Amino acid sequence: MKTLTRKLSRTAITLVLVILAFIAIFRAWVYYTESPWTRDARFSADVVAIAPDVAGLITNVSVHDNQLVKKDQILFTIDQPRYKKALEEAEADVAYYQVLAQEKRQEAGRRNRLGVQAMSREEIDQANNVLQTVLHQLAKAQATRDLAKLDLERTVIRAPADGWVTNLNVYTGEFITRGSTAVALVKQHSFYVLAYMEETKLEGVRPGYRAEITPLGSNKVLKGTVDSVAAGVTNASSTRDAKGMATIDSNLEWVRLAQRVPVRIRLDDQQDNLWPAGTTATVVITGKQDRDETQDSFFRKMAHRLREFG
């Protein structure tokens, strides 16, 4: 009898432990799979593609790759003598037409004062027409001069904002064409995180909710706030034909993968380029307030650690 009782006790204890372990694992798994978090997140920043508005030989490159520059700092300079000559020519044209316009204005004024008593109406009208033509030519010359001045100013390529020069691929002596991207500028203090959340987890994501960001390979946890949720993503199963009609994929997959929706997260503290744009991170949405780590249960802490490994 005593042996039977002992066996039953052992069996009951084992069964209870198995049930408790199953409950703990189940709760951890539910929390792990259904709570709003993702390992598919990336640091991003505002990037300006810098391209010259004029063409010519590069005479000087004033920065080096990955350099931190200030707004209006010179990045590189394009051959200026040619544009200076163009400006001088345009200014000479303006001066010529200014003198010519003054002469024609005086002549037209003189003929208008004399009137039809001294000359024919045709001669008076002709003088006025010549004056208007010269004035139009003067206006055109002034516009050409202003454009030449603008081109000369734009031979000096400056940084549009504070930031880091990256992917610098221009060198002194190269010929660069108008509109060709020469360098990218990553704006300082513009870093944010794009977290690609599965659609099944969007119920727990709202603008204003707090977020924890853990960069890949780091134990440091950054804080942030959900700024916005994308209003739409591309529908890969629907396209348009040549007439604009919808074309729907007739194949229905047995396993439906949850779509990922971009969620923009604003960082509380800018980390400069400590984590460059494009690097990955794990993001956890904690709700309206930051998570109190001291109140986390064991299985919740375990779930947080599991996130770092998949």
Swiss-Prot record:
**Organism annotation:** Citrobacter koseri (strain ATCC BAA-895 / CDC 4225-83 / SGSC4696)
Q: Where in the cell is it found?
A: Cell inner membrane
Cross-referenced InterPro entries: CusB-like_dom_1 (IPR043602), CusB_D23 (IPR032317), MFP_Efflux_Pump (IPR050393), PHBA_efflux_pump_AaeA (IPR022871), RND_pump_MFP (IPR006143)
Chief location? membrane
Quote the protein name from its UniProt record: p-hydroxybenzoic acid efflux pump subunit AaeA
This entry's Gene Ontology molecular function terms read:
transmembrane transporter activity
Query: Which residues span the membrane?
Result: 12-32
Q: Which GO terms describe its cellular component?
A: plasma membrane
Family the UniProt entry places it in:
Belongs to the membrane fusion protein (MFP) (TC 8.A.1) family.
The protein's topology relative to the membrane is: Single-pass membrane protein
Q: Which UniProt keywords apply?
A: Cell inner membrane, Cell membrane, Membrane, Transmembrane, Transmembrane helix, Transport
In the UniProt record, what gene is named as encoding this protein? aaeA
What SUPFAM superfamilies does this protein map onto?
A: HlyD-like secretion proteins
Q: Which domain of life is it from?
A: Bacteria
Q: What does this protein do?
A: Forms an efflux pump with AaeB.
